[in-house]
């Protein structure tokens, strides 16, 4: 190599290095903006560290300090059930019953427009990034713009989820769910955190008991008998907000989801065969392979004079193909079972989830106002006294009453319920408000006698 050629190659190398730095520099100028765009997302590196801590534990049964991490705030009665209970206990006379029903109608009327406006704002924020939009396509967004819009939607969702009495699941809880698998869950999945930008879970309605059959995964069969359903910790509703690096924001709601099965709800996962099942399948392959080799291989070896090395090679290829087919069929069956389970668990997705959350928040708002109205009416001093003292009294009374009626420990937000009640007080008695348009009564529909069809006389 001459000096001239070496200098020429070196110059090309420096030029290529300069171009490469320029290209990567343009990318680096974009991606450092992601932390600012994402706001405070879940630190997936911290999540991975917590998962490592749970892997070192021996058979953990629940997340650490679970009673402090998760507080149930969902009122486990529908509005109609709550009205009947309040009427039976506090408003038994006809006049009191009519007054409570009128108050309930007034709350419904006032909250309807409030949550309709919230839903309209949410849908306007979500529409540019809605993957299920049925209208004409809008100009495509860049990845940083899409991430910024997604974080804006999530920030707007937080107060609505709080009013709907969803509790956010902590990073420690998610680490437990990603590591620990229930022994009766035959379908297990593997999640690669490197594929995700953020993962958020909210839940309500914690229960401990036997899960509904269609929401379960696995056949629950032992070696010789069918195992009885185990009691598990699960949630009546779970909301997921997740984003993969190559995808978009996924908003989904599920019902009857066990704590150890949260990872099954994520959009990017791989079905894997549990260790015990893999060991059993391998044992079956070895036993059947030895039997085939003894019965068939020895005959081929002696009668056809095939070399031992060639016979072993053919046998290894045969067993490898058989093992690959068996494990592939097993994974396909498990993937189908997981798909069937998610079909029954899924309740709403993306834009429909926003509407469902607005309705649920309105319902919880009404129930909190009804409880505050009924309990403060029987308090000796009413709303007299400091707001802090009143809210503490209201919280204690309502929590004890809900525990006695439902058997569930519910954390009641007395301060928020008082605020709901006080916001309604100035307009009480104005239902419907002055100037509200009234619909004309529906005219009764009378059935007209069928007209006789003209008949032609045939002579």
Curated annotation (Swiss-Prot):
Pfam families: DUF3754 (PF12576)
Region ranges (Disordered): 435-459
Sorted UniProt keywords: Membrane, Phosphoprotein, Transmembrane, Transmembrane helix
Entry protein name: Transmembrane protein 143
Biased composition (Polar residues): 448-459
Localization per Swiss-Prot or TrEMBL: Membrane
Cellular-component GO terms for this entry: membrane; mitochondrion
Domain of life: Eukaryota
Organism: Homo sapiens
Main location group: membrane
Positions of post-translational Phosphoserine modification: 332
